Amino acid sequence: MRITVPAETKVAETRVALTPEGASELVADGHEVWVQRGAGAGSALSDDDYARAGVSLVDVDDAWSGDLVLKVKEPTPEEYPRLTSRALFTYLHLAANEP
């Protein structure tokens, strides 16, 4: 399974949905893991950390192309078009989106 991690786009969100350690375990279990370049920067996790874990560093389009997409925050309206037939694992925070 290809598991992908796009960078978070919500203002002031510095977390990333998957650490290099977690990615390493998924890779060891036979999964392909792709992380958007710079996605871990706000959490002091470098692209080199992910590369050492066996992750492929990709652009935003590829980061949304996985069989399973991991995010911390709910998708923003700008990200809605990227929600096609993929599985998304995230917190939805539905009440936070109320007008």
Predicted features along the sequence, with ranges:
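Structural/interface elements that position substrates and couple domains in central-metabolism enzymes
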Residues: 1-99
